[in-house]
């Protein structure tokens, strides 16, 4: 491999919004702030988050729903 053309591969700290702190290696060069991680992601925890599904989709479904279905 050529010398001097590859980025530095350093240890950084990745901090999740749930408070989980991980030491990882990356070429980013600075610490990361994550929204979700393996300890708080709904897929891994089995818990479902409440997500507001309002707005345009609900308005569309209400407008074009067939009476008597569901």
From Swiss-Prot:
Keyword terms of this UniProt record: Metal-binding, Ribonucleoprotein, Ribosomal protein, RNA-binding, rRNA-binding, Zinc
Q: What is this protein called?
A: Large ribosomal subunit protein bL31
Q: Which cofactor does it need?
A: Zn(2+)
Molecular-function GO term, any one: rRNA binding
This chain's function reads: Binds the 23S rRNA.
PANTHER family reported in the protein's UniProt record: 50S RIBOSOMAL PROTEIN L31, CHLOROPLASTIC (PTHR33280), LARGE RIBOSOMAL SUBUNIT PROTEIN BL31A (PTHR33280:SF6)
Q: Which InterPro entries match?
A: Ribosomal_bL28/bL31-like_sf, Ribosomal_bL31, Ribosomal_bL31_A, Ribosomal_bL31_sf
Which BP terms from GO are recorded?
Answer: translation
Q: From which organism does this entry originate? A: Klebsiella pneumoniae subsp. pneumoniae (strain ATCC 700721 / MGH 78578)
HAMAP family given for it? Answer: Ribosomal_bL31_1
What Pfam families does this protein's entry cite? Ribosomal_L31 (PF01197)
Q: Which SUPFAM superfamilies match?
A: L28p-like (SSF143800)
Keyword hit for Ribonucleoprotein: yes
Name of the coding gene = rpmE
What does the entry list as the binding residues for Zn(2+)?
16, 18, 37, 40
Q: Which Gene3D superfamilies match?
A: Ribosomal protein L31 (4.10.830.30)
Quote the subunit structure annotation: Part of the 50S ribosomal subunit.
Is Transmembrane helix among the key words of this record?
no
């Amino acid at each position: 491999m050529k010398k001097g053309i590859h980025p530095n591969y350093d240890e950084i700290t990745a901090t999740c919004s749930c408070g989980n702190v991980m030491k990882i290696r990356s070429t980013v060069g600075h610490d990361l702030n994550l929204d979700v991680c393996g300890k708080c992601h709904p897929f891994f925890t089995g818990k479902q988050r409440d997500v507001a599904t309002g707005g345009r989709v609900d308005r569309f479904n209400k407008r074009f729903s067939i009476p008597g279905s569901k």
